[in-house]
Amino acid sequence: MINVGAVLSLTGSQAESGQMAKEGYLFCQDWINAKGGVTLRGAGHRLNIDIGDDQSRPSIAAAVTEQLITQNHDTLLLGPSNDATTSRAAPVAEQHQVPMVTNGASSDAIFNNHYHYLFGVLAPHSRQLQGVIDMALAQNPKPASMAILAASDSLSAEVANATVGYAQAKGLNVVYGASYTSGVNDLSGLLGAAAGAGPDLLFEVGHPAESVRTIQQAQQMKIQPKLLAFADGPGTAQFTNDLRAAANYSVGTTQWAPGTRNRTSYFIDSFHYSLAFAVQFGHMPDQYAAAATAACLTLEVAIEQANSTQARWVRDALSVIDLNTFFGEIKFDDRGANTAKPVYVQQVQAGHPVLIWPPEVATARPRYPDPGWAKR
């Protein structure tokens, strides 16, 4: 049997995504074992994922990582399920020279530490909104300008700064940019200032509740750019439930969706993954479950390519892996970040999120420019 440790947020503030990640790992474990296990030297070995709860607390994540390595003797790790916990768990894995494939870290600040043993299957934060810009620039009429509002937390600022840099490199004129305190209830002043600059595209980089307030207040103020785009919100049931018809034509991003049609070199496609997952757990997978399954598959393939569970050999196999999965391409740069993977662009159309970019995975065409509040 091959034992692999996993650090997940099963309780606390990040429990919802952590529980989905747990199911994603268990699906992968069961799928691998059903096909005969992990193949080493011609023989199949059952996979057992040894899960520890970090309670959504970074300090606990470090302690759980230490426990999995020193007490449970796990020499290969999965997780953690978010950036904050990974930031504390990764140095522990690095100290013990234990490979860690995380399903939840995408902050460039983490990967810029150039850890030797950390690998992440998510596309980095810096690329989160690049697809929205690429999509918009492919439309007619082609946008010329944008404005951006961003929450003051470090992750939102990271995404916003990267988005501005990418937009400028693509020739867009950034006519307005401002930061607001995370959790603020009134964005009308900033929205008015942004609208006054006359942007074709208006980006909001924050959290789901702030995205909802942006739509509500933009509608009240009759602010109508050609596109409203968000780092978080569109694509979730809560967003469309809160906004109803007003949610239509808003654009957001996701690391994965059940309708994603990726070319696969290993494992099943998104459609069959979603069906099998729903049969096993009684509900559809989300991007957090899918990322966990992808992380687990990546580690399995690395073990088989190394033909060993020795930490150093598996680490070396991870560093050169190139895998086309239902989740997207998995290929790590010299930081351990998965820069090969696209972030998918979704748009709410007729009350439901649909994939609109990249073209090779899209299930619908972008609705651009936004037809206006009266036509929602």
At which residue positions do the language-model features occur?
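Extracytoplasmic "Venus flytrap"
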Residues: 1-28, 52-58, 81-82, 149-157, ...
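Beta-alpha junction/loop-to-helix N-cap segments that form part of ligand/metal-binding clefts
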Residues: 3, 16-23, 38-112, 121, ...
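Short, polar/charged alpha-helical segment
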Residues: 17-40, 161-168
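Extracytoplasmic ligand/sensor domains, especially the bilobed periplasmic-binding protein
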Residues: 23, 71-177, 226-252
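Hydrophobic alpha-helical segments within soluble ligand-binding/sensing domains
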Residues: 61, 120-145, 185-188, 211, ...
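Hydrophobic alpha-helical
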Residues: 83-94, 192, 199-221, 295-298
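Extracellular/periplasmic periplasmic-binding protein-like sensory domains
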Residues: 215-293, 309, 353, 359-375
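Segments of small-molecule ligand-sensing domains
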Residues: 276-289, 298-357
